[in-house]
Amino acid sequence: MAEFSPKLKEALSLVQKPGRYTGGEPGCTYKDKANVDVRMAFCFPDTYEIGMSFLGEKILYELLNRHENWWCERAFMPWVDMKEQMERLHIPLYCLESKDPLTDFDIVGFSLEYELCYTNILAMLDLAGIPLRAADRDERWPLIISGGPCVCNAEPMADFFDIMQLGEGEQMLQDICATVEAGKKAGWNKDQLLFELSKIPGVYVPSFYDVTYLPDGRVESIKPNCPGVPERVTKAIVKDMDSFVPPENFVVPMVGAVQDRACVEVLRGCVRGCRFCQAGQLYRPFRERSPKLISESARVLCRNTGYDELSLSSLSTSDHSRLEDILDELNSWAETDHVSLSLPSLRVDNFSQSLVEKTTKVRKSGLTFAAEAGTQRLRDVINKNVTWDQIERGCRIAFAEGYTSVKLYFMMGLPTETLEDIKGIADTAQQVVDLYYSMEHPKGKGVQVTISVACFVPKPDTPFQFCAQDRRETLREKQKYLLSCVHSRKIKVNYHDSATSVLEGVFAKGDRRMGRVIETAYHNGAFFDTWEEFFSYDRWLEAFAACGLDPDFYNYRALGLDEVTPWSHLDVGVTHAHLVREYQKALQAQTTQPCNRQCSACGANKLLGGPCFDYSKNSL
């Protein structure tokens, strides 16, 4: 473990939670720098507690460190008090393992999980003393890269990154490290390195593409300016989930993380085709891990880390075709080891008594059902394929098994939504309350139904990308109306300020010009925009005005079905024709079957090189 400098010791003595910045946690990796050829700093643009909850970092950290001559370390966005001390004492941003500044690394990688973390990325580069824009960095600086779901529309942050990874990182990031290693040995300059990196499936080099605009501000084209790079960058995927063993060790945080438990990814992708859900489109095609590998990896992970809770992670865990087998495999050792099982992504339509029994042998965890919309009409519009009868059945099973609290997740501002749909949210919650009291229940034990309502944001690569977003004032009125429809003290309503959703929508569909706005807002004091106490909507409006851009143009304007978008040159697998088809079906409130029952011809199968499912069998 590296020594603490006198300046760092002073800073740590003056901040809350110094454990965020010390490293030395169980499970972290140390190597002899003399034997390391490639050093990578994995940077998460939020606090330690949030970043240490991110499964993607855990997967890639262990995967890269399996290579003897590569060393992956970690850095997080310092909290305000530590940021001030680092600036005062001139301590550059460093990695926790070696305490070396980011400028000592070959690769500095950021995870783009959420649009409102963009200014934190600039803050971290600034703290490290690294020029913000890629054009201002030559081969003497680390290669600045990014990955994550926000790369599906890379353009708002394109000016700040040398390369951006579209798709899944397990193989792509190893190929990047291998290419950087080769470039160091061969003495390539930056342009040579970027060109070689552009050959890797999923790697997007923004500087190799020029953007032109129409007089009305829409994108006219995004085309390569360098011979030999692809017209469209196609995302990288892991074809066989069993080809990469899940992490068998985690860095166990010194400061309590938001999600502090063992976690194994059981599948990737989703069969459901919800029209609002970006993740369900981005992570297609659907791929499963085998029950045996899941169980073996999970057992080793729990024993290595000491965790007594195991989460089975995915977009929809209950859609795994062999979920019962997975639970049987896990329960063969979990109860003996006093490890409880958690299924965070359950579909109410395949929730069963058997699942409850197999996941509550040690202790009960929370129960959340995503109804998404308050009426059947709107659930059909968004292709949720869930009925009230299924919601009632799921809650009935839960109450019969002793649950006395249920969380229901909804969205507000969905396309075609009316006030009747908003009232339906309150009505659904009241029906759940009434159901509880119509059943046998412990004497004196009441029920708590929590409604969590998010503001809908149209996202790229979804059928609703063509839709305009509800205005902030409209969302506020809908929130007030919902509260007026709730009359029971057994129902709790949670929602957040619509201003952050509006800004999220602007960045989600923004073009490359958005980088100037982000940089301007950062220089004017914007960072930690995901935290209510630091977010300033007015500051962002001032940044838009200073850059001569109108935020309304991006999120309050419907896209033409044939419009060139800022993400048209990035291929996530799902075709434009499929998105148009699903959008038109949504306007007619027509549903589409889950793709393991009937292929919807979305196009993602091309990434596998064949069909996603054997339709000669009944997959569900």
Where is each model-derived feature located?
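Glycine-rich beta-alpha loop elements in corrinoid/cobalamin-binding modules
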Residues: 78-223, 460-511, 519-532
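Radical SAM enzyme core and accessory elements
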Residues: 1-29, 40-42, 487-620
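Short secondary-structure boundary/capping segments
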Residues: 57, 89, 125, 159-164, ...
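N-terminal pre-triad scaffold of radical SAM enzymes
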Residues: 40-46, 64, 251-276, 302, ...
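N-terminal [4Fe-4S]-dependent radical SAM core
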Residues: 9-41, 48-49, 206, 212, ...
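A short beta-strand-loop structural module common to alpha/beta enzyme folds
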Residues: 69-81
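Canonical Radical SAM [4Fe-4S] cluster-binding loop centered on the CxxxCxxC motif
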Residues: 54, 256-292, 601-616
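Conserved SAM/AdoMet-binding glycine-rich loop
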Residues: 42-43, 47, 107, 116, ...
